[in-house]
């Protein structure tokens, strides 16, 4: 029975993933046609490669329709409810680093922690006649961090369809939860990260579907990739 490994379909994530695999002894033979999203691995007839977007890889791992995949931990934990029951992180690959953070306008000088934000949220409705609005693409992680971890309940998530960091300046939100690598885009939009506002430090990971976790072949592939990372 073959094993399906889903890889990012484009960009630096794809390039770096292919390099990690080659270091582990898995040379991916790319198709001649860029529209062909399947590939093979030299000398590994039972290992199928499938190229997908990083978000689709997270979904398919959750469904169990692929055995292994490379995607960001942020996408795994945002896309899948009860992620740890559905997938296992086999290895952190050392690239694609980014943090999911809570950021507020720099002019909120007295707001530096989540406790400060709790105070702001509590009286925001009284002052403004509405709940604190948070623009984000990460609604699951936001709810878990605000409601479950910090007990903040009085807020409203505004779905972000464009550049999340521009939402406060545009007036569509009061603050944001977004992903950042260097913080430069946040600073350019006059936003600051709260001192304890890092929700998740994410990076590209090798992830297995729990359905496939007992497969000896899946574990062998994961072990070889882990060993390659140590070279």
Curated annotation (Swiss-Prot):
Pathway membership: Amino-acid biosynthesis; L-histidine biosynthesis; L-histidine from 5-phospho-alpha-D-ribose 1-diphosphate: step 1/9
Main localization of the protein described in the UniProt heading: cytoplasm
Localization per Swiss-Prot or TrEMBL: Cytoplasm
An annotated GO cellular component: cytoplasm
CDD domains: PBP2_HisGL3
Self-association state and partner proteins as the record states: Heteromultimer composed of HisG and HisZ subunits.
The protein's name in its UniProt record: ATP phosphoribosyltransferase
Underlying gene: hisG
């Amino acid at each position: 029975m073959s094993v399906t490994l889903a890889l990012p379909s484009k960009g630096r994530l794809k390039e770096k993933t292919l390099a990690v695999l080659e270091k582990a002894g898995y040379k991916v033979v790319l198709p001649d046609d860029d529209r062909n999203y399947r590939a093979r691995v030299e000398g590994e007839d039972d290992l199928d490669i499938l190229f997908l977007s990083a978000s689709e890889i997270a979904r398919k791992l959750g469904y169990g329709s692929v055995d292994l995949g490379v995607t960001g931990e942020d996408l795994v934990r945002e896309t899948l409810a009860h992620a740890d029951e559905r997938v296992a992180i086999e290895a952190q690959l050392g690239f694609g680093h980014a943090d999911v953070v809570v950021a507020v306008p720099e002019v909120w000088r007295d707001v530096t922690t989540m406790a400060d934000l709790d105070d702001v949220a509590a009286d925001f409705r009284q002052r403004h006649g509405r709940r604190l609005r948070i623009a984000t693409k990460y609604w699951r992680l936001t709810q878990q961090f605000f409601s479950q971890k910090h007990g903040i309940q009085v807020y409203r998530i505004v779905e972000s369809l464009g550049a999340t960091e521009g939402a406060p300046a545009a007036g569509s939100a009061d603050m944001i939860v977004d992903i950042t690598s260097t913080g430069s885009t946040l600073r350019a939009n006059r936003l600051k990260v709260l001192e304890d506002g890092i929700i998740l430090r994410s990076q590209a990971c090798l992830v297995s579907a729990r359905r496939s976790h007992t497969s000896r072949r899946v574990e062998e592939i994961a072990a070889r990739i882990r060993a390659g990372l140590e070279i």
